[in-house]
């Protein structure tokens, strides 16, 4: 896309929001309580603050304020307000490619807020437990929050991810013409690294004329031992392993497709 010479500030708002899900099987009530306590501690407000603060570092933003809260009986929220920084337009990368990984860092952000909320959940029947984290990165200016996507998905490894990206508003060039998007994008997938894309089955639902992009991700490989909490698959009977595997896959597909699947 040809570089635009703008009249005043770039007034486009770019919002990236995604849900990540972690699924687990806990055989007993004690194990279910243990999983909820474990995941709640793993993603407590302090840990989430570290992840989001590193995100700000990656995109080169100044943190103005941090509001964080752990909730009872479970869950946490963190919101970070970020200030704009001077940006040299010549240094802005508007190409469609993956953002940095945790070990690679440099981009600039004009203005942003970043927030995350967590939702651990379980049910006494079936032994299935889920953990959901909702994350939103919203910016005003020349940089797309998609540059933070790769890092955040790597940090919050998950079984299912649903991602939404939208560009709102408009900005004007020096001739007064309105521009409703200032960068090229065909798919959110183009902002993910190859190793990330190789791990997931993905599908896009995009409304290009409205600058709305949606991608869903489902982990390809399934190893039962990674989904058991304090129980080893070898300690179960073959029938139990098959039943638990079927229940986990059904749960994951229902979340991925956003609808209940009738039992066959």
UniProtKB/Swiss-Prot annotation:
Record-marked site positions (Cleavage (non-hydrolytic)): 111-112
InterPro entries given in the database record: AdoMetDC_fam_prok, S-AdoMet_deCO2ase_bac, S-AdoMet_deCO2ase_core
Residues with Pyruvic acid (Ser) modification: 112
Source organism, top-level taxon: Bacteria
Gene Ontology CC terms: cytosol
PTM remark: Is synthesized initially as an inactive proenzyme. Formation of the active enzyme involves a self-maturation process in which the active site pyruvoyl group is generated from an internal serine residue via an autocatalytic post-translational modification. Two non-identical subunits are generated from the proenzyme in this reaction, and the pyruvate is formed at the N-terminus of the alpha chain, which is derived from the carboxyl end of the proenzyme.
Alphabetical list of NCBIfam families matching this protein: SAM_DCase_Eco
Task performed by this protein: Catalyzes the decarboxylation of S-adenosylmethionine to S-adenosylmethioninamine (dcAdoMet), the propylamine donor required for the synthesis of the polyamines spermine and spermidine from the diamine putrescine.
Family matches, as HAMAP family: AdoMetDC_2 (MF_00465)
Listed name of the protein: S-adenosylmethionine decarboxylase proenzyme
Source organism: Citrobacter koseri (strain ATCC BAA-895 / CDC 4225-83 / SGSC4696)
